Amino acid sequence: MEKIKKQNNIGSYSSDKDGEYKKFRFSKTSIRGFLLKEYEREVPIIVKIQSYRNKFLDFYFKMASILGEEVFFILALPISTWCVATQLGVELCVVLALTIGGGNILKNTFTLPRPPPNIVWTNTAHQKDHGLPSTHTASAFGLTFYFLIYTYFLFPTIGESFNISLLSMFFIVLFWSTSVMFSRLYNGHHTPMDVIAGLIVAITSILATTYQLRYFIEGMVLSETFLFGPMLYIAILSAILFFHPQANTGPTPAYPETGLVCGASLGSLISLWLHAQHPCPLMNQELLLLEANYDSIVSTIHSIPLLLHGSRILIGLVLVGIAKVFSKKFFFFAYDLVIRANTNNEQSQPITTVSFDPNKKIIVTPTIEAFSKLFVYTCVSFTIVSMPYLFYYLNIQTSADVTRYY
């Protein structure tokens, strides 16, 4: 185990500082020390799991791991919003922020290492952030099981429309999420302790959203005053990013990812607030039928449900992609102007560089990168939840656009 112990030196506190905190039984340092010992004990478990490797499992768990990526869920969230219910998409964004954002805060707090790559085989690219908890596990369990709870327990009429029994949907969701969880072990990215911690984060996020946060969202959405609605949420998320712990081992993707998922929840909530204040018009079915008689395209689209939903998803994803590109360019263009207006001082090599002048580069600190993702994904999720207005004018509206559950 000597090699493993050597890996643990990364990001660990000095022995002097450890001694300083020994009197605090529940200090961060003592907890981290306990978790590090457990980490050392569990690395051989990963080696044992990987002793059963074969080509099929390599491929299967590589694909399963993708199903837990936050980018995958952000691409999949529009389907829930446009094909099931607008409010469902918003609440899933909140669960995404809780699971990944909360997980990243824990990652940067305890800075526990991942299984050492010189001992453990990795199926995919080596992860640059820390280990505990597994945010793939947290987001996979959190989002899929909240989807199940929302559609079969909170609003069972939605589940009935799927023509899938509750038991069947439960096993689908369980198979999906457990595949993601085991992929993190098989691929050599996490120890059992990490995925168990991710599962705890997921359960906590589901319970918090189901029994408390969804009522907070309802009160915020129905508030006629912008100050006590979206502005309150903006203040909360800004405080989270300002006080987000930074890893003492150097910058990692965890902090910017928190900005990303916070932006996803913020934009969707702002748009839902606008929906409450200015509801999307309900398409007149008689006029639609009359127009369909004269417009063969409208008639064809509405006669084939798969074509109707496919058209909505295609149009929506194109506009979401445009919103993402232009919001990012706008943020860094504005940031570039502010920086150049206030200083001409050349700094060290940036973590991320975005330049509109090929001869000059601007410096992007981790904080700026996190807030850039907050802004960009606020615009992205705002566009997603605002699409029902466009669908109305394009005559491709469905019940998902106008049904209210608050």
Curated annotation (Swiss-Prot):
Q: Does the keyword Transmembrane apply?
A: yes
Residues the record marks as active site: 136, 190
Which BP terms from GO are recorded? phospholipid dephosphorylation
Q: What organism is listed for this UniProt entry?
A: Dictyostelium discoideum
**Location within or outside the cell:** Endoplasmic reticulum membrane
Taxonomy of origin reads:
Eukaryota, Amoebozoa, Evosea, Eumycetozoa, Dictyostelia
Enzyme Commission identifier(s): 3.1.3.-
Q: Per the record, which residues fall in region Phosphatase sequence motif III?
A: 183-194
* CDD domains per record: PAP2_SPPase1
Spell out the residues of the site Stabilizes the active site histidine for nucleophilic attack.
Answer: 194
Phosphatase sequence motif I: annotated segments: 107-115
**Where is the segment annotated Phosphatase sequence motif II?**
133-136
Provide this UniProt record's keywords sorted from A to Z.
Answer: Endoplasmic reticulum, Hydrolase, Membrane, Transmembrane, Transmembrane helix
**Residues passing through the membrane, by range:** 66-86, 92-112, 138-158, 162-182, 193-213, 225-245, 254-274, 313-333, 374-394
Q: Which SMART domains match?
A: acidPPc
Q: Which Pfam families match?
A: PAP2 (PF01569)
Membrane topology label: Multi-pass membrane protein
Record's signal peptide: none
Family of the protein in this entry:
Belongs to the type 2 lipid phosphate phosphatase family.
Instruction: List GO molecular-function terms, semicolon-separated.
Output: sphingosine-1-phosphate phosphatase activity
Name of the coding gene: sppA
Q: What does this protein do?
A: Has enzymatic activity against both sphingosine 1 phosphate (S1P) and dihydro-S1P. Regulates intracellular and extracellular S1P levels.
Top-level enzyme category: hydrolase
| GO cellular component terms given for this protein | endoplasmic reticulum; endoplasmic reticulum membrane
Q: What name has this protein been given in UniProt?
A: Probable sphingosine-1-phosphate phosphatase
